Amino acid sequence: MSAPIYLGVIGVGGVGTAFLNQLARLPNAPKLILLARSSQTLLSPTPSYSPTIPAAEWKTAVETPSLTKSGALTPDEIATYLASAPGRSILVDNTSDPALASNYPVFLRKGISVVTPNKKGFSSDLSLWKEIFAAAAEGKALVYHESTVGAGLPVISTLKDLVNTGDEVTRIEGVFSGTLSFLFNTFAPASGSSSAKWSEVVSQAKELGYTEPDPRDDLNGMDVARKLTILARIAGLDVQSPDSFPIESLIPAELTSLPSSADGIAQFMARLPEFDSQMAAIKEGAEKAGKVVRYVGSVDVAKKEVRVGLQQFDKDSAIAGLKGSDNIISFYTRRYGSNPLIVQGAGAGGDVTAMGVTADLLKVIERL
Protein backbone atom coordinates (compact mmCIF):
# COMPACT_ATOMS: atom_id res chain seq x y z
CA MET A 1 0.00 0.00 0.00
CA SER A 2 1.38 3.41 -0.99
CA ALA A 3 2.13 5.96 1.72
CA PRO A 4 -0.56 8.59 2.31
CA ILE A 5 -0.12 12.02 0.74
CA TYR A 6 -1.18 15.14 2.64
CA LEU A 7 -2.73 18.23 1.13
CA GLY A 8 -2.96 21.90 2.09
CA VAL A 9 -5.31 24.15 0.11
CA ILE A 10 -5.25 27.95 0.18
CA GLY A 11 -8.10 29.92 -1.40
CA VAL A 12 -11.79 29.03 -1.64
CA GLY A 13 -13.00 31.53 -4.25
CA GLY A 14 -14.47 30.47 -7.59
CA VAL A 15 -11.55 28.25 -8.62
CA GLY A 16 -10.91 27.05 -5.05
CA THR A 17 -14.52 25.97 -4.53
CA ALA A 18 -14.63 24.17 -7.89
CA PHE A 19 -11.34 22.44 -7.04
CA LEU A 20 -12.67 21.20 -3.68
CA ASN A 21 -15.77 19.82 -5.43
CA GLN A 22 -13.53 17.92 -7.85
CA LEU A 23 -11.22 16.78 -5.04
CA ALA A 24 -14.21 15.33 -3.16
CA ARG A 25 -15.02 13.09 -6.13
CA LEU A 26 -11.50 11.69 -6.59
CA PRO A 27 -10.95 8.05 -5.69
CA ASN A 28 -8.01 7.71 -3.29
CA ALA A 29 -7.80 11.47 -2.80
CA PRO A 30 -4.91 12.83 -0.72
CA LYS A 31 -5.64 13.67 2.92
CA LEU A 32 -6.84 17.28 3.21
CA ILE A 33 -5.22 18.57 6.42
CA LEU A 34 -5.19 22.35 5.88
CA LEU A 35 -7.76 24.68 4.33
CA ALA A 36 -7.05 28.40 4.45
CA ARG A 37 -9.11 31.39 3.43
CA SER A 38 -8.31 35.06 3.94
CA SER A 39 -9.12 35.26 7.66
CA GLN A 40 -9.39 31.67 8.86
CA THR A 41 -7.45 28.41 8.69
CA LEU A 42 -8.84 24.94 9.34
CA LEU A 43 -6.31 22.25 10.33
CA SER A 44 -6.15 18.59 11.22
CA PRO A 45 -4.78 18.40 14.79
CA THR A 46 -1.14 17.49 15.33
CA PRO A 47 0.71 15.21 15.85
CA SER A 48 -1.69 12.66 14.34
CA TYR A 49 -2.88 14.90 11.45
CA SER A 50 -6.24 13.21 11.95
CA PRO A 51 -9.16 13.54 11.41
CA THR A 52 -8.83 15.08 7.97
CA ILE A 53 -11.01 17.86 6.55
CA PRO A 54 -13.90 16.55 4.39
CA ALA A 55 -13.55 18.24 0.98
CA ALA A 56 -17.25 17.73 0.19
CA GLU A 57 -18.40 19.35 3.45
CA TRP A 58 -15.66 21.94 3.87
CA LYS A 59 -18.16 24.75 4.48
CA THR A 60 -19.60 23.06 7.57
CA ALA A 61 -16.33 21.43 8.69
CA VAL A 62 -15.53 24.57 10.67
CA GLU A 63 -18.14 23.38 13.20
CA THR A 64 -16.34 20.06 13.71
CA PRO A 65 -14.92 20.14 17.28
CA SER A 66 -12.11 17.68 16.48
CA LEU A 67 -10.55 20.03 13.89
CA THR A 68 -8.25 22.90 14.86
CA LYS A 69 -9.29 26.47 14.02
CA SER A 70 -6.86 29.33 13.59
CA GLY A 71 -6.66 32.81 12.16
CA ALA A 72 -4.61 33.49 9.05
CA LEU A 73 -1.22 31.74 9.14
CA THR A 74 2.00 33.00 7.56
CA PRO A 75 3.54 31.04 4.67
CA ASP A 76 6.34 29.93 7.04
CA GLU A 77 3.80 28.58 9.55
CA ILE A 78 1.90 26.73 6.82
CA ALA A 79 5.13 25.27 5.42
CA THR A 80 6.26 24.06 8.86
CA TYR A 81 2.86 22.44 9.49
CA LEU A 82 2.77 20.64 6.11
CA ALA A 83 6.43 19.58 6.31
CA SER A 84 5.76 17.88 9.67
CA ALA A 85 3.00 15.64 8.27
CA PRO A 86 3.81 11.89 8.38
CA GLY A 87 4.22 11.64 4.59
CA ARG A 88 4.82 13.74 1.46
CA SER A 89 2.70 16.89 1.26
CA ILE A 90 1.41 19.16 -1.50
CA LEU A 91 0.35 22.80 -1.38
CA VAL A 92 -2.46 23.88 -3.73
CA ASP A 93 -2.57 27.68 -4.02
CA ASN A 94 -5.88 28.75 -5.58
CA THR A 95 -5.28 32.46 -4.93
CA SER A 96 -3.75 35.20 -7.07
CA ASP A 97 -1.71 36.45 -4.10
CA PRO A 98 1.78 37.67 -5.11
CA ALA A 99 3.06 37.46 -1.51
CA LEU A 100 2.17 33.76 -1.25
CA ALA A 101 3.68 33.07 -4.68
CA SER A 102 6.95 34.72 -3.65
CA ASN A 103 7.13 32.16 -0.82
CA TYR A 104 6.92 29.05 -3.03
CA PRO A 105 10.69 28.46 -2.55
CA VAL A 106 10.06 28.16 1.23
CA PHE A 107 7.63 25.27 0.63
CA LEU A 108 9.68 23.60 -2.07
CA ARG A 109 12.92 23.55 -0.04
CA LYS A 110 11.01 21.71 2.69
CA GLY A 111 9.96 19.05 0.15
CA ILE A 112 6.40 20.36 -0.25
CA SER A 113 5.27 20.20 -3.89
CA VAL A 114 3.29 23.14 -5.30
CA VAL A 115 0.27 23.06 -7.63
CA THR A 116 -1.31 26.37 -8.61
CA PRO A 117 -3.18 28.51 -11.16
CA ASN A 118 -1.53 31.62 -9.59
CA LYS A 119 0.44 33.38 -12.34
CA LYS A 120 2.32 35.73 -10.03
CA GLY A 121 5.20 33.43 -9.06
CA PHE A 122 5.97 32.42 -12.64
CA SER A 123 5.51 35.78 -14.36
CA SER A 124 7.10 38.23 -11.94
CA ASP A 125 10.82 38.92 -11.72
CA LEU A 126 13.01 36.35 -13.48
CA SER A 127 14.99 35.81 -10.28
CA LEU A 128 11.88 34.38 -8.54
CA TRP A 129 11.22 32.03 -11.47
CA LYS A 130 14.77 30.69 -11.22
CA GLU A 131 14.60 30.43 -7.43
CA ILE A 132 11.33 28.45 -7.57
CA PHE A 133 12.79 25.72 -9.78
CA ALA A 134 16.13 25.67 -7.93
CA ALA A 135 14.25 25.24 -4.64
CA ALA A 136 12.18 22.40 -6.13
CA ALA A 137 15.35 20.57 -7.16
CA GLU A 138 16.90 21.18 -3.73
CA GLY A 139 13.85 19.89 -1.85
CA LYS A 140 13.13 17.08 -4.34
CA ALA A 141 9.65 18.56 -4.77
CA LEU A 142 7.52 19.17 -7.86
CA VAL A 143 5.97 22.33 -9.32
CA TYR A 144 2.97 22.21 -11.66
CA HIS A 145 1.19 25.32 -12.93
CA GLU A 146 -0.76 24.30 -16.06
CA SER A 147 -3.69 26.57 -15.22
CA THR A 148 -1.55 29.72 -15.18
CA VAL A 149 -2.08 29.87 -18.97
CA GLY A 150 -5.30 28.88 -20.73
CA ALA A 151 -7.20 27.64 -17.64
CA GLY A 152 -7.61 23.87 -18.14
CA LEU A 153 -6.25 23.78 -21.69
CA PRO A 154 -3.03 21.74 -22.13
CA VAL A 155 -0.93 24.74 -23.15
CA ILE A 156 2.05 24.53 -20.79
CA SER A 157 2.29 20.72 -20.91
CA THR A 158 2.23 20.83 -24.74
CA LEU A 159 4.99 23.46 -24.88
CA LYS A 160 7.10 21.55 -22.34
CA ASP A 161 6.71 18.35 -24.38
CA LEU A 162 7.87 20.17 -27.53
CA VAL A 163 10.90 21.63 -25.74
CA ASN A 164 11.81 18.49 -23.78
CA THR A 165 11.72 16.26 -26.88
CA GLY A 166 14.14 18.55 -28.70
CA ASP A 167 11.80 20.36 -31.08
CA GLU A 168 12.73 23.94 -31.94
CA VAL A 169 9.90 26.33 -31.07
CA THR A 170 10.17 29.35 -33.40
CA ARG A 171 7.00 31.29 -32.62
CA ILE A 172 4.01 31.24 -30.28
CA GLU A 173 0.91 33.27 -31.12
CA GLY A 174 -2.63 33.39 -29.86
CA VAL A 175 -5.58 34.84 -28.03
CA PHE A 176 -4.79 34.33 -24.35
CA SER A 177 -7.60 36.22 -22.61
CA GLY A 178 -11.14 34.87 -22.43
CA THR A 179 -12.33 38.38 -21.64
CA LEU A 180 -10.63 40.06 -24.61
CA SER A 181 -11.65 37.16 -26.85
CA PHE A 182 -15.31 37.75 -25.97
CA LEU A 183 -14.96 41.53 -26.39
CA PHE A 184 -13.53 41.39 -29.91
CA ASN A 185 -15.56 38.39 -31.12
CA THR A 186 -18.65 40.41 -30.16
CA PHE A 187 -17.45 43.87 -31.23
CA ALA A 188 -15.93 42.82 -34.58
CA PRO A 189 -17.27 39.37 -35.58
CA ALA A 190 -15.61 37.62 -38.53
CA SER A 191 -18.98 36.65 -40.00
CA GLY A 192 -21.91 39.05 -40.11
CA SER A 193 -21.64 42.47 -38.55
CA SER A 194 -22.17 44.15 -35.21
CA SER A 195 -23.44 47.66 -34.55
CA ALA A 196 -22.59 47.43 -30.85
CA LYS A 197 -20.42 50.19 -29.47
CA TRP A 198 -17.19 49.26 -27.66
CA SER A 199 -18.40 50.59 -24.31
CA GLU A 200 -21.63 48.56 -24.66
CA VAL A 201 -19.68 45.36 -25.26
CA VAL A 202 -17.44 46.05 -22.23
CA SER A 203 -20.56 46.65 -20.08
CA GLN A 204 -22.13 43.43 -21.36
CA ALA A 205 -18.96 41.45 -20.58
CA LYS A 206 -18.86 42.94 -17.08
CA GLU A 207 -22.51 42.01 -16.44
CA LEU A 208 -21.89 38.45 -17.67
CA GLY A 209 -18.97 38.09 -15.26
CA TYR A 210 -16.37 37.78 -18.04
CA THR A 211 -14.30 40.71 -16.79
CA GLU A 212 -12.51 41.27 -13.53
CA PRO A 213 -14.52 43.40 -11.04
CA ASP A 214 -12.46 46.29 -12.44
CA PRO A 215 -12.48 45.81 -16.26
CA ARG A 216 -9.25 47.83 -16.48
CA ASP A 217 -7.46 44.77 -15.08
CA ASP A 218 -8.36 43.03 -18.36
CA LEU A 219 -8.08 46.02 -20.70
CA ASN A 220 -4.54 46.96 -19.60
CA GLY A 221 -3.15 43.77 -21.19
CA MET A 222 -1.13 42.77 -18.12
CA ASP A 223 -2.93 39.42 -17.69
CA VAL A 224 -1.97 38.48 -21.26
CA ALA A 225 1.57 39.78 -20.70
CA ARG A 226 1.97 37.52 -17.65
CA LYS A 227 0.89 34.47 -19.66
CA LEU A 228 3.30 35.37 -22.49
CA THR A 229 6.12 35.79 -19.95
CA ILE A 230 5.53 32.25 -18.68
CA LEU A 231 5.46 30.69 -22.17
CA ALA A 232 8.49 32.67 -23.36
CA ARG A 233 10.50 31.47 -20.36
CA ILE A 234 9.54 27.83 -20.98
CA ALA A 235 10.57 28.31 -24.62
CA GLY A 236 14.01 29.41 -23.41
CA LEU A 237 13.88 33.22 -23.31
CA ASP A 238 15.05 35.01 -20.18
CA VAL A 239 12.19 37.52 -20.03
CA GLN A 240 12.94 39.75 -17.03
CA SER A 241 9.33 40.66 -16.19
CA PRO A 242 5.95 41.19 -17.90
CA ASP A 243 6.61 44.91 -18.24
CA SER A 244 9.92 44.43 -20.05
CA PHE A 245 8.25 44.26 -23.50
CA PRO A 246 5.58 46.31 -25.35
CA ILE A 247 2.01 45.97 -24.05
CA GLU A 248 -0.78 47.82 -25.85
CA SER A 249 -3.31 48.99 -23.27
CA LEU A 250 -6.96 49.44 -24.26
CA ILE A 251 -7.53 51.92 -21.43
CA PRO A 252 -7.89 55.46 -22.80
CA ALA A 253 -4.99 57.60 -21.54
CA GLU A 254 -7.43 60.08 -20.04
CA LEU A 255 -8.91 57.36 -17.79
CA THR A 256 -5.72 55.70 -16.53
CA SER A 257 -5.51 57.86 -13.40
CA LEU A 258 -8.99 57.01 -12.08
CA PRO A 259 -8.77 55.22 -8.70
CA SER A 260 -9.35 51.47 -8.39
CA SER A 261 -12.14 52.03 -5.85
CA ALA A 262 -15.80 51.22 -6.57
CA ASP A 263 -16.31 54.90 -7.36
CA GLY A 264 -13.34 54.88 -9.74
CA ILE A 265 -14.69 51.80 -11.56
CA ALA A 266 -18.11 53.48 -11.88
CA GLN A 267 -16.46 56.63 -13.28
CA PHE A 268 -14.49 54.53 -15.78
CA MET A 269 -17.62 52.75 -17.04
CA ALA A 270 -19.53 56.05 -17.22
CA ARG A 271 -16.81 57.80 -19.26
CA LEU A 272 -15.85 54.90 -21.55
CA PRO A 273 -18.51 55.85 -24.20
CA GLU A 274 -16.55 59.08 -24.81
CA PHE A 275 -13.90 56.94 -26.52
CA ASP A 276 -16.15 54.66 -28.62
CA SER A 277 -15.15 56.51 -31.79
CA GLN A 278 -11.48 55.54 -31.27
CA MET A 279 -12.29 51.81 -31.17
CA ALA A 280 -14.77 52.19 -34.05
CA ALA A 281 -11.99 53.69 -36.18
CA ILE A 282 -9.68 50.74 -35.41
CA LYS A 283 -12.46 48.29 -36.30
CA GLU A 284 -13.32 50.12 -39.55
CA GLY A 285 -9.66 50.33 -40.55
CA ALA A 286 -9.43 46.54 -40.39
CA GLU A 287 -12.74 46.10 -42.23
CA LYS A 288 -11.53 48.26 -45.14
CA ALA A 289 -8.63 45.81 -45.53
CA GLY A 290 -11.10 42.88 -45.42
CA LYS A 291 -9.86 41.89 -41.97
CA VAL A 292 -10.88 41.90 -38.31
CA VAL A 293 -8.99 43.20 -35.30
CA ARG A 294 -8.07 40.92 -32.39
CA TYR A 295 -6.05 41.30 -29.18
CA VAL A 296 -3.19 38.81 -29.32
CA GLY A 297 0.09 37.91 -27.74
CA SER A 298 3.12 36.61 -29.61
CA VAL A 299 6.59 35.30 -28.84
CA ASP A 300 9.18 35.32 -31.63
CA VAL A 301 11.77 32.98 -30.15
CA ALA A 302 14.41 33.55 -32.85
CA LYS A 303 14.24 37.35 -32.56
CA LYS A 304 13.74 37.16 -28.77
CA GLU A 305 10.72 39.44 -29.06
CA VAL A 306 7.51 39.35 -27.03
CA ARG A 307 4.56 41.59 -27.89
CA VAL A 308 1.00 42.05 -26.69
CA GLY A 309 -1.60 44.14 -28.50
CA LEU A 310 -4.03 44.65 -31.37
CA GLN A 311 -3.44 42.98 -34.71
CA GLN A 312 -5.44 42.52 -37.92
CA PHE A 313 -6.32 39.02 -39.16
CA ASP A 314 -7.94 37.60 -42.29
CA LYS A 315 -11.58 36.75 -41.65
CA ASP A 316 -11.01 33.08 -42.50
CA SER A 317 -8.11 32.69 -40.04
CA ALA A 318 -8.41 30.50 -36.95
CA ILE A 319 -7.92 33.48 -34.63
CA ALA A 320 -10.65 35.52 -36.36
CA GLY A 321 -13.08 32.60 -36.22
CA LEU A 322 -13.01 32.11 -32.45
CA LYS A 323 -16.38 32.04 -30.70
CA GLY A 324 -17.44 33.34 -27.31
CA SER A 325 -14.59 33.58 -24.83
CA ASP A 326 -12.42 30.81 -26.30
CA ASN A 327 -8.63 30.91 -26.32
CA ILE A 328 -6.41 29.72 -29.15
CA ILE A 329 -2.66 29.18 -28.94
CA SER A 330 -0.55 28.25 -31.99
CA PHE A 331 2.92 26.73 -31.62
CA TYR A 332 5.13 27.09 -34.70
CA THR A 333 8.04 24.64 -34.56
CA ARG A 334 10.67 23.02 -36.76
CA ARG A 335 8.86 19.66 -36.67
CA TYR A 336 5.41 21.06 -37.38
CA GLY A 337 6.63 23.28 -40.22
CA SER A 338 4.19 25.80 -41.66
CA ASN A 339 1.16 24.17 -39.99
CA PRO A 340 1.27 25.03 -36.29
CA LEU A 341 0.22 22.79 -33.43
CA ILE A 342 -2.97 24.46 -32.16
CA VAL A 343 -4.58 24.29 -28.71
CA GLN A 344 -8.07 25.79 -28.62
CA GLY A 345 -11.03 25.89 -26.24
CA ALA A 346 -12.47 27.55 -23.17
CA GLY A 347 -9.74 29.63 -21.59
CA ALA A 348 -11.63 30.94 -18.58
CA GLY A 349 -14.09 29.75 -15.94
CA GLY A 350 -13.87 28.24 -12.47
CA ASP A 351 -14.63 24.64 -13.43
CA VAL A 352 -12.16 24.38 -16.32
CA THR A 353 -9.42 26.21 -14.40
CA ALA A 354 -9.98 23.88 -11.43
CA MET A 355 -9.81 20.91 -13.80
CA GLY A 356 -6.29 21.98 -14.76
CA VAL A 357 -5.36 22.23 -11.07
CA THR A 358 -6.87 18.82 -10.27
CA ALA A 359 -5.11 17.21 -13.24
CA ASP A 360 -1.80 18.71 -12.06
CA LEU A 361 -2.45 17.38 -8.55
CA LEU A 362 -2.92 13.87 -9.96
CA LYS A 363 0.35 14.16 -11.92
CA VAL A 364 2.22 15.17 -8.77
CA ILE A 365 0.69 12.29 -6.78
CA GLU A 366 1.79 9.83 -9.51
CA ARG A 367 5.35 11.13 -9.35
CA LEU A 368 5.85 11.40 -5.58
From Swiss-Prot:
Details of cofactor binding: A sodium ion is seen in the structure; a metal ion may subtly affect the relative position of the nucleotide-binding region to influence enzyme activity, and could increase the stability of the enzyme.
Cofactor requirement: a metal cation
MF (Gene Ontology): homoserine dehydrogenase activity; metal ion binding; NAD+ binding; NADP binding
Pathway in which this enzyme or protein is active: Amino-acid biosynthesis; L-methionine biosynthesis via de novo pathway; L-homoserine from L-aspartate: step 3/3; Amino-acid biosynthesis; L-threonine biosynthesis; L-threonine from L-aspartate: step 3/5
Entry's induction text: Down-regulated when grown with elevated levels of potassium chloride.
EC number, UniProt record: 1.1.1.3
Active site per the UniProt annotation: K227
A single GO BP: threonine biosynthetic process
Record's keyword annotation contains Thylakoid: no
Residues engaged in binding NADP(+): V15, T95, K119, G209, E212, G349
Residue positions binding Na(+): E146, V149, A151, L153
Name of the protein described by the UniProt record: Homoserine dehydrogenase
Taxonomic source organism: Emericella nidulans (strain FGSC A4 / ATCC 38163 / CBS 112.46 / NRRL 194 / M139) (Aspergillus nidulans)
